[in-house]
């Protein structure tokens, strides 16, 4: 009797496992993929707050209000410009081409696409805003707010969408075999290049160096604020990288997202520890400003 019960249990267990990992329907995969885009986009949107807090905490007290206004403004501008022309500049590009169309985004969702077009727009828009946020941090206390807003409009509406479309939109970089999983080049390369150009053109912050060229220490407005921003950015990276799997409708996709989360956490933790060790060895004296900026 016991053997019969165990045999039946094994049979039913195998049936359950088989059904649990059976391929989901096309509609279910569509829902799960769209859900991944929306939730991941929400996490990436929180990074705007993280950037704002980190920058506000690291600049001098007199510049905090300007930093807050800049971050709210750039996110708003990014949303409008990416809807107005940015998305179609990136995704309206001919296969192997260089430039999409200067047209406004419209919803063209279809079940065969595997995800909602509007969820994809939202996910890509927050990436666009993150690109501008990279520039904002570099140009803190270097540029007035309205010239920065003008640059943000050009970056998020034209520059970033065009180079993004070269790979993610099926443009010439994609045709050449170039791959960018989560924006290491398209987002951070573009944002970093723009930030570097701005820093070169504008030069150092006023008062950063004395007449002899010696570095003048600046007092940060709030280390706890910068630390809070760091943790929010750390949190947001799970959406940034995890959402870049672009699918959650299969067993392998979900496992991949989990692996991405682990790698993301290890990368942030490794950055903190490495920065602390190098700072200690290089400067002999440890500085508390190192950790929030290296996570």
Residue ranges and their predicted role:
Residues 1-23:
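N-terminal secretory/membrane targeting signals
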Residues 283-284:
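Membrane-interface helix caps and helix-loop-helix hairpins in membrane proteins
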Residues 16, 287-288:
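Serine/proline-rich low-complexity intrinsically disordered segments, especially terminal tails, linkers
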Residues 273:
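Oxyanion-binding "anion nests"
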Residues 288-295:
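Single conserved hydrophobic/aromatic residue that forms the stacking wall/gate
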Residues 23-210, 220-231, 235-263, 269, ...:
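Metal/cofactor- and membrane transport-associated sequence elements
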